[in-house]
């Protein structure tokens, strides 16, 4: 029950940060659709390569919300490196909080 509360708290924080101007980075269009369905209203960017995505997000507050699988972790790691070259420190803690609660059942953003 506590994990479920933590999950919903993390989703509410995601929605609030997005509404406050944070940009959410995801892997694909299904992820965008899923986040819209749960009420994320702000800008959502689909990952399109490390350099181009980092350049596009330069100077913005960023939440990396890639899938909880090896591809998602590789994208997260590369984006962290690329964004840090611009002096940007994206939020990855929210992803950890969301998937920590549900990782046994859900590993993809589109399944949220």
Question: Predicted segment positions?
Answer:
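TOPRIM fold recognition
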Residues: 29-38, 45-48, 52-112
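Phosphate-handling DNA/RNA-contact segment within nucleic-acid enzymes
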Residues: 1-23, 29-36, 56-57
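Short active-site oxyanion
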Residues: 19-24, 42-43, 61-62
């Amino acid at each position: 029950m506590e994990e479920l509360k933590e999950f919903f708290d993390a989703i509410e924080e995601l929605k609030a940060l997005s509404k406050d101007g944070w940009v959410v980075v995801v892997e694909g269009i299904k992820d965008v659709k899923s986040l819209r369905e749960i009420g994320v209203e702000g800008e959502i960017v689909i990952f399109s390569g490390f350099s181009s995505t980092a350049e596009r997000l330069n100077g913005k507050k960023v939440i990396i919300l890639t899938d909880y699988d090896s591809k998602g972790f590789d994208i997260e790691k590369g984006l962290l490196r690329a964004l840090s070259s611009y002096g940007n420190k994206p939020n990855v803690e929210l992803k950890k909080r969301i998937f920590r609660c549900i990782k046994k059942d859900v590993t993809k953003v589109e399944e949220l």
